[in-house]
């Protein structure tokens, strides 16, 4: 039988049959998998026995290390306007890791009722043709266009805690997961999601995962940092050297620095890029 792992708890695997969508809970990994030091993760396509073991893991089309998920069709990156406040640095961190794995992205901007200037904060990303939806969870409305984008795909949900991921999932899939308000003292959300799991309803599937503190950047290389910034791509081919990292090179040798000087690249996006390079050099994410 062929299925997909939808949840892992304490070494047990919940698997959904791909043909009839029936759930088979509490399966174990076979001795052969353990012998090969192969660990199944959420999203894996597997061969399994109905009342026993997972026997085979199929090749993954993509994979994140932490949270451990595989075979993502697209990522839903949540970012709030207020509580917690919008941060282009935080958003670029998410985009860096997701786009380095060539995973398509949809930006979901929440809490738009808290700031009438919400669209201006995302202008740079709109100019880069990101697919952006503005969400007001309190109105309990999900745009029809967004539903069409999510249908028949495995959608990976990621974002800082407190931005409204759980509220969105509750509204979208008619679930009743726990919701925590933003922490007043730290201006950060309290975690409500404890395990990585695939939540399914009809033709919609969403991977819910713990919040930002468990997200890992250690899997990103220096080249991937350079290549992940979409705003650089239209200029970088004009750099004098193919190995240009747009940092220590002279302005006349670096097309990115020239575009920055001419106002074609926003200064804050370039500063975010330099921040990631600096963190990489220190190996401190």
Swiss-Prot record:
GO biological process, one term: ribosomal small subunit biogenesis
Positions of Zn(2+) binding: 239, 244, 246, 254
Main location as per UniProt: cytoplasm
Keyword RNA-binding: yes
Subcellular location: Cytoplasm
EC number: 3.6.1.-
Bilayer-crossing regions: none
Residue ranges of domain CP-type G in the record: 61-215
GO CC entries: cytoplasm
The keyword Nucleotide-binding is assigned to this record: yes
Molecular function as annotated in GO: GTP binding; GTPase activity; metal ion binding; rRNA binding
Residues that coordinate or bind GTP: 110-113, 159-167
Keywords from the UniProt entry: Cytoplasm, GTP-binding, Hydrolase, Metal-binding, Nucleotide-binding, Ribosome biogenesis, RNA-binding, rRNA-binding, Zinc
First-tier enzyme category under EC: hydrolase
Domain of life: Bacteria
Cofactor binding: number and manner: Binds 1 zinc ion per subunit.
Cofactor: Zn(2+)
Role played: One of several proteins that assist in the late maturation steps of the functional core of the 30S ribosomal subunit. Helps release RbfA from mature subunits. May play a role in the assembly of ribosomal proteins into the subunit. Circularly permuted GTPase that catalyzes slow GTP hydrolysis, GTPase activity is stimulated by the 30S ribosomal subunit.
Cross-referenced NCBIfam families: ribosome small subunit-dependent GTPase A
Subunit annotation: Monomer. Associates with 30S ribosomal subunit, binds 16S rRNA.
Protein family membership: Belongs to the TRAFAC class YlqF/YawG GTPase family. RsgA subfamily.
Stated name of the protein: Small ribosomal subunit biogenesis GTPase RsgA
Lineage: Bacteria, Bacillati, Mycoplasmatota, Mycoplasmoidales, Metamycoplasmataceae
Gene designation: rsgA
